[in-house]
From Swiss-Prot:
Location relative to the cell: Endoplasmic reticulum membrane
Gene: SEY1
Residue ranges of coiled coil: none
Residues that bind GTP: G44, S45, Q46, S47, S48, G49, K50, S51
Organism of this sequence: Saccharomyces cerevisiae (strain RM11-1a)
Protein name: Protein SEY1
Length: 776
């Protein structure tokens, strides 16, 4: 059967065609057929005109017998052809369905003789996979038992019931009996009744399996009958009858339309091929195995002997031929193929004379031994190739343009490239039959590449974490220290807000969703989450270290003293206070002390404004342990808590308060001394002395209009300042002016002294130079 339009689906050796799916794909091209296809089989006696009928009806090109030469078997096995052109009486304009036609080897042929195993299995297969089974028979065969294949149909019905009878679906097969050479003497209805009675009788007498005892023939099959005129004697009528038959395959919606929904297997085309192959496998395995005969035993012994001789000769030539070529794929594969073919040819020449099944069995074993020996060389070559490809991958990743190509893209591209090259090399060995199974090698290659990519990924991750740490740690320290050095009642709220925002700012480039991050190195969601957790651990440890290192006793005392002095020494506008009375000092002292101690408890225990203790949301220790939150004693016998929020112990708090009280008390005493000094600085009699001694000047001022005007202005200014209590700001302005004047005078004097000193030094250097010249 050489026609390109058909393939041998099952050959005469009962082997299913492994490229059936590719054939279907070639037939339909890129079209999405879905369920819009149909399968038809033809079944009947050998040389009964089955292939001829199919060719005329479906425009196929199955081989047919030339009766003028010899009546013999033409169709061997089961052949499959595709068509969309059905011979009909009218033209069908709409798109016709895809029809796949199975031409089954004829039954009752002399070539197989009494071996009816294949024809039974072929008939059963045709019923199992087809929607319509055309039973081709001659009119004169009706009424016969063997001649019209009733015995075969009985066997097929029995096996069909045992294999497929328990299915709960409503699938049926249409048995279309085509009665050939129908001359019309006996009406078609009479012939159909005869065949129907025979089939019903056969079904009644079947040995039905459990669960199918009450089943009917019509539960599984529908019956249709068509008569065709004699092809040679009534050629025109035969053609017309065939066209009428074709109408029933294309006229949808009519009563005689053959492709009814219940006949379809409801499988896509590629699913049907798998179903057909499984059916044939199930049918083929349903047999008894025969014991080997003496002839088979001899064949096994001789083929084993020939195989060993060929293998020994192969091994003797192998090493010296292969060693120089291990680094060149083309030369290596050519030599391996040559050695292998020489070995198999030697075996074939001698062993092919024995039983074919034994010969092929031993040949397969020899081929396996050869491949096993060759696999060592192939593995060595592929391992060397793996190292080279890995070096290429590392180079490509390290030399990538980081501005335009991400790590993941670079690794993916490099991995794809080396996998392609590796697979191409491996496929070369496989196509040449040198490598039977590549699963182990592929797995090893994949595992090795994944492990090495993991190393690259770890290095990239380490670099990313390093960059994040470089920015995160100092930024976090600076912000925390700044907030703690100027604390408020809500300082811990501010610290935690700043803590979260600092983390977020440093890893915002990797955020994909809320609380979800992708660090762009090809990690899974859980792995990215783990890295994010590690970054938080780093941040929390930095926060913990910064807080506990900064908030020592001396630092807290200094913070409290600064807060005290901000209120005690300066008013609300930031101006220095001028004390008048001790009561004013004492009142301000109490306010300043309260202001300072507002944050004492805040700095002793890290709690939010809602009085909730701050607890890290990640483990602070290297490993979780039950000791993390326990109290421990230091070398000096002082108890401490391991909790982040616990900053000062009770003993440390007392120490802070003692130091703070001492320092602020000193400040208050100094302020009170300044009042006493101011009050006792000028004795009252000085004012009397000034009045007596300055009387002449006073009279001179009164007599001079200019002096009088200045006196009035100064007096009014003095009154206003005194009336509204503006002496404090005036004193501040005067002090500032005096201070600036003093500073300016000092700078001028310093500049004058420095310049004078430089002039003297220059003169001395000139004198020194002259003296040296004189000495020379």
């Amino acid at each position: 059967m050489a026609d390109r339009s058909a393939i041998q689906l099952i050959d005469e050796e009962k082997e299913f065609h492994q490229s059936a799916l590719q054939y279907f794909q070639q037939c339909i091209g890129n079209r999405d057929v879905g369920l819009d296809y149909h399968v038809i089989s033809v079944f009947g006696s050998q040389s009964s005109g089955k292939s001829t009928l199919l060719n005329v009806l479906f425009n196929t090109n199955f081989d047919t017998m030339d009766a003028q030469v010899k009546r013999q078997q033409t169709t061997k096995g089961i052949w499959l052809a595709h068509t969309k052109q059905v011979n009909t009486t009218i033209e069908i304009d709409n798109d016709r369905p895809d029809i796949f036609v199975l031409d089954v080897e004829g039954s009752d042929g002399s070539e197989r003789g009494e071996d009816q195993d294949f024809e039974r299995k072929a008939a059963l297969f045709a019923i199992a996979v087809s929607e319509v089974l055309i039973v081709n028979m001659w009119e004169q065969q009706i009424g016969l038992y063997q001649g019209n294949n009733m015995a075969l149909l009985k066997t097929v019905f029995e096996v069909n019931l045992s294999l497929f009878g328990k299915n709960d679906n409503d699938h049926k097969v249409l048995l279309l009996f085509v009665i050939r050479d129908h001359v019309g003497v006996t009406p078609l209805s009479s012939l159909s009744d005869s065949v129907t009675r025979e089939l019903e009788k056969i079904w009644t007498e079947l040995s039905k399996p459990a669960g199918c005892e009450g089943s009917s023939l019509y539960d599984y099959f529908d019956l249709k009958f068509v008569g065709l005129a004699h092809k040679l004697l009534q050629e025109d009528k035969f053609t017309q009858d065939v066209k009428k038959l074709g109408d029933s395959f294309v006229m949808k919606g009519t009563e005689n339309y053959y492709f009814k929904p219940q006949y379809h297997h409801r499988l896509p085309l590629d699913g049907w091929t798998m179903y057909a192959e499984n059916c044939w496998d199930q049918i083929e395995r349903n047999k008894d195995l025969d014991l080997p005969t003496q002839q088979i035993l001899v064949a096994r012994f001789k083929t084993e002997e020939i195989s060993n001789e060929a293998l020994e000769e192969f091994i003797s030539k192998y090493d010296e031929s292969i060693a120089p070529l291990k680094g060149n794929l083309g030369s290596l594969t050519s030599q391996l193929v040559k050695l292998k073919e020489e070995c198999l040819t030697k075996y074939d020449e001698q062993a092919s004379r024995y039983a074919r099944n034994v010969y092929m069995e031993k040949r397969e074993a020899l081929n396996t031994n050869l491949n096993s020996h060759i696999s060592g060389t192939i593995n060595e070559f592929l391992e060397s190739l793996m190292e080279k490809l890995w070096d290429d991958l590392k180079l490509e990743v390290s030399s990538r343009d980081k501005a335009t190509t991400s790590f993941v893209e670079s690794v993916a591209a490099g991995k794809s490239k080396i996998e392609k090259e590796f697979n191409e090399s491996m496929e070369t060995f496989k196509k040449l039959g040198l490598l039977i199974s590549n699963e182990e090698i592929t797995c090893k290659f994949s595992d090795d590449i994944e492990e090495r990519i993991k190393q690259l990924r770890d290095a990239e991750l380490k670099a990313k974490i390093g960059r994040i740490k470089k920015n995160l740690v100092p930024e976090l320290k600076d912000h925390v220290i700044h907030l703690l050095s100027h604390p408020s009642k809500k300082v811990w709220d501010d610290i935690m807000n700043d803590f979260e925002s600092t983390i977020k700012d440093n890893i915002s480039a990797y955020q994909v969703e809320k609380d979800k991050y992708d660090f762009k190195i090809g990690l899974s969601e859980s792995e990215n989450a783990k890295i994010y957790k590690n970054i938080r651990i780093l941040a929390w440890r930095t926060l913990d270290t910064t807080v506990h290192d900064y908030l020592k006793i001396d630092t807290i005392v200094s913070i409290l003293r600064d807060r005290f002095e901000d209120v005690f020494r300066y008013d609300a506008e930031g101006s220095p206070r001028l004390w008048k009375t001790e009561e004013e000092i004492d009142g301000t002292f109490r306010v300043a002390k309260e202001h300072a101690l507002e944050v004492f408890e805040v700095l002793s225990l890290a709690v939010t404004s809602d009085n909730v203790e701050i607890i890290p949301d990640v483990p602070m220790a290297e490993e979780e342990s039950g000791e993390d939150n326990e109290i421990y004693r230091d070398n000096e016998g002082v108890f401490h808590s391991r909790r982040f929020a616990h900053i000062l112990t009770e003993l440390q708090k007392e120490n802070v308060l003692d130091q703070f009280r001492r320092q602020i008390n000193i400040t208050v005493l100094d302020s009170k001394r300044s009042i006493i000094t101011t009050r006792t600085h000028i004795p009252p009699w000085i004012y009397v002395l000034l009045a007596v001694l300055g009387w002449n000047e006073f009279v001179a001022v009164i007599r001079n209009p200019l002096f009088v005007t200045l006196t009035l202005i100064l007096g009014a200014t003095f009154f206003v300042i005194h009336k509204f209590g503006l002496w404090g700001p005036v004193v501040n302005v005067v002090q500032s002016a005096v201070g600036e004047t003093r500073t300016a005078i000092k700078d001028k004097l310093r500049q004058f002294v420095v310049e004078d000193h430089e002039v003297k030094e220059s003169f001395e250097m000139k004198d020194f130079s002259k003296n040296e010249q004189k000495e020379k």
